[in-house]
Regions:
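Glycine-rich phosphate-binding loops of nucleotide-dependent enzymes
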Residues: 2-243
Length: 243
């Protein structure tokens, strides 16, 4: 069953096409990877999905329903949650309060929200930090809190943006385990990730984009061997080295 469908997504900023003709489908229970060099349009696609930016053209469907132009909070209530590459929790509030605030997307009373928040905190391994202020957490735990907040909305589709960025190897392994366990519990996932070890380990299929356009879709093995993908990443590396 197809959970999510993006049809010919286009987004212009002035005369610049940040996303141009991107189409893909995600099946129920799938972890779908989205890769590309820096500035290729990956996060812009997430911003289009939850209507942080309006589409220039194209359409987006959750199951059989178009969500194009829908308010962001309504998209969340329908079942799409996301994390952000630069995490910004409610810094002066506790972990529990942060997650409780997210839980109100799904329930109506403080008692229900706190119950859902604690269940989600325990699942994500943050129970011992529930009374800590978010601003006191190191980056690895703030990244985990970001996932926990999104998960407390009980999404059908979870969008993860650079979850592994800035993590130690141990934290990276823990993040992979958490994402896989979330997926095993029935949540479909689209993940943006720049660390190839992570994306190749957890994704069932991957879409590679460059300059806002799709260049390849396939299994991790197929993507790793694709000449256009290799060229896109080698080109980025050469530019970074000034060659």
């Amino acid at each position: 069953m197809t959970v999510f469908k993006a049809q010919d997504l286009v987004k212009y900023f002035g005369g610049l096409a940040a996303v141009n003709g991107v189409s893909f489908q995600v099946k129920k229970g799938e972890i779908f990877g989205l890769i590309g060099p820096n500035g290729s349009g990956k996060t812009t696609i997430f911003n289009l999905i939850n209507n942080y930016y309006p589409l220039t053209s194209g359409d987006i469907h959750l199951y059989d329903r178009s969500i194009k132009g829908m308010k962001t909070y309504k998209i969340c209530k329908l079942g799409i949650a996301r994390t952000f590459q630069v995490v910004k929790p409610l810094a002066r509030m506790t972990v529990l309060d942060n997650v409780t605030a997210s839980a109100f997307c799904r329930v109506n009373t403080i008692k229900e929200a706190q119950k859902l928040a604690m269940e989600t905190i325990e699942f994500c391994g943050l129970a011992s930090y529930k009374d800590h202020k978010a601003k006191s957490l190191p980056i690895g735990l703030r990244k985990r809190l970001e996932i926990t907040r999104a998960l407390a909305t009980q999404p059908k589709l979870l969008l993860l943006d650079e979850t592994a960025a800035g993590l130690t190897p141990k934290e990276m392994g823990q993040a992979i385990e958490l994402i896989q366990e979330i997926n095993r519990r029935g949540v479909t996932i689209i993940i943006i990730e720049h660390i190839m070890k992570v994306i190749m380990t957890i994704s069932h299929r991957i879409l590679a984009i460059n300059h806002g356009q799709p260049i390849a879709t396939g299994t991790p093995k197929e993507i790793a061997a694709n000449p256009q993908v290799i060229e896109a990443y080698l080109g980025e590396e050469k530019n970074a080295q000034g060659d």
